[in-house]
Structure formats: structure tokens, C-alpha cells
Amino acid sequence: KSKGYNIISNDIQYYSYVLNKHLIGNNPPITAEQIEYLNALKGTEGFIYKNYCAGSGCGRNYFTDENGKKCDSIRIGLERLKNDGDIDESQYYYLLASLINSIDKYANTASVYGAFLKGIKKSAQKEFKLELLPIIDGNEHNEVYNEDINHLIHRINGDILYLDPPYNAR
């Protein structure tokens, strides 16, 4: 992207699509006020808390209760900002990709999400803070898809094709 090449990216997994949507397809402006607003939100008992935090009674310990709630608040806040027209699509994907990237730094895992640790490790105890991913300047004509490659391949073309199929059973 930074070298000016046109890039076409596809991933069937939504989290990866979101990251690529920002890193490959995006050059959005974000204000300090938007980040301050999201980081100042009070915790909400949402999806992450209910499914990945011990305090919810789900039996999992992937995030502290506080960080899970904070992640949920920011995720809900992003939807509100988008639906109210306060951020556009490029800003939405930038902030959502930054949330996905940020929350991983606070995960109570040994590095993969196959299992959580019994005790809360030191990095997972830190208070969650949304940190922005870098903006990679470059060509604005890149394409990012979230589709089955078997269908997409008939609608796109390029000079080089790199496929990275799933390689494990998880």
C-alpha cells in the first residue's frame, strides 16, 4: 500500500476483514475528542463481559471484568457514533480495527485464545485503553472483501495471487 500498488484483500473471518479494511483500504481522519469520548465511557455488561469474563458467571477468564465491560462500552459507542452519523464508514472501521488490536493487549491468555489462564496475568490487569492503529498512507483504490473466495475469484483480477488457507483444526 505504501509503495502505491493496488491491493485486493479478502478474508472470510470478520475480525480479519475489519483489520484489513483499515490497514489496506483506509486513510481516515480521527479527532482526539473521538478517542477521549470512547475511552471515557463507563463499562457495560455486554457480549464480551457475558461470554469472556469470570464475573458474569460464564466460567471463562479471558479478560478482567472491568476490561470486558470497557470493551463492550466502546463497541456499543462505535455503533452509536456510526448510526448517529458522527463518524463515516472509514472512521468506523479504523476505530473498530483499533479496538480489536487494543483488546488483545489485555487478554488473559498465553498468546492464543484456545485457553485462558487461571490467574490474571500482569498485562491483563492493566486498565483497558483504546489505542489507534497507525494509518498507512498510500493508494486509495485498494479493495477489501469479506466473502467466500470461491465466489469472489470470478469477479476480481490481478497480477499476483497469494492464498493463505486455514492451517489448523481450531
Language-model segments: residues:
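Structural motif
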Residues: D159-L161
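Class I S-adenosyl-L-methionine-dependent methyltransferase module
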Residues: N6, I12-D137, A169-R170
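Short conserved loop adjoining the S-adenosyl-L-methionine
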Residues: H151-N157
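Conserved SAM-binding loop of SAM-dependent methyltransferases across substrates and taxa
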Residues: K1-Y5
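Short hydrophobic/aromatic-enriched beta-strand-loop microsegments
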Residues: S9-N10, D164
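Short acidic, Gly/Ser-rich segments with clustered Asp/Glu that frequently serve as metal-coordination loops
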Residues: H154, P166-R170
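Conserved acidic residues
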Residues: D148
